[in-house]
């Protein structure tokens, strides 16, 4: 995310559907209060991977917020959740397994949909359950 020098800011998505990026930016503006209308936005998914699963929505939005604010995300943070048009955070399949696997890989903090909160605590990991995009932004 960077200030645009052009009349129409660019939206470039590599590894993510262009329409998904446009929808996520609209939700971020409406329910996150971030004005990115005059910003160029570039999203590049590492390793040539194509993100088709909506569970990456929240992580993508938080990475864009991180870039816009020039505040890096915590390296020990894992994030997942589908973002709806009304700013709600929807659960994703296999949430418990995702958290356990993230903990095995050294992640110490997670921001996830409330419905994906673990039934039992995960050793060494603080899990934050959210239901709205605005709540996720408060935890950055």
Feature annotation, model-predicted:
Residues 1-140:
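Peripheral, non-AAA+ core regions of ATP-driven protein-machinery
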